[in-house]
From Swiss-Prot:
One of its GO terms (cellular component) is ribosome. This is Large ribosomal subunit protein bL28. GO terms for biological process: translation. Gene3D superfamilies: Ribosomal protein L28/L24. It comes from the Bacteria. The keyword Ribonucleoprotein applies. Belongs to the bacterial ribosomal protein bL28 family. It comes from Leifsonia xyli subsp. xyli (strain CTCB07). Keywords: Ribonucleoprotein, Ribosomal protein.
Length: 78
């Protein structure tokens, strides 16, 4: 599963793990990605989205209908 949020577009960040002796090793900071299923009344079906924790909060605030409308407008496959 790709570590990209469908709503916010959050992608992994890159940086270093720094040990006690300050040796730096490359690492990846992944967003908190979850698969969530929502029922969308206008489509009359369930929609499964790959979301970050912030993306889930956006859906809670704006509503699934508004978010799905935006996703369809920008050509996202649902």
């Amino acid at each position: 599963m790709a570590a990209v949020c469908q709503v916010t577009g959050a992608t992994p960040g890159f940086g270093h793990s720094i040990s006690h002796s300050h040796r730096r090793t490359k690492r990846r900071f992944d967003p908190n990605i979850q698969k969530k299923t929502y029922y969308v009344p206008s489509l009359r079906r369930n929609v499964t989205l790959t979301l970050s924790a912030k993306g889930i909060k956006v859906i809670d605030a704006r509503g699934i209908e508004a978010v799905v409308k935006d996703l369809l407008a920008r050509g996202e496959k649902i």
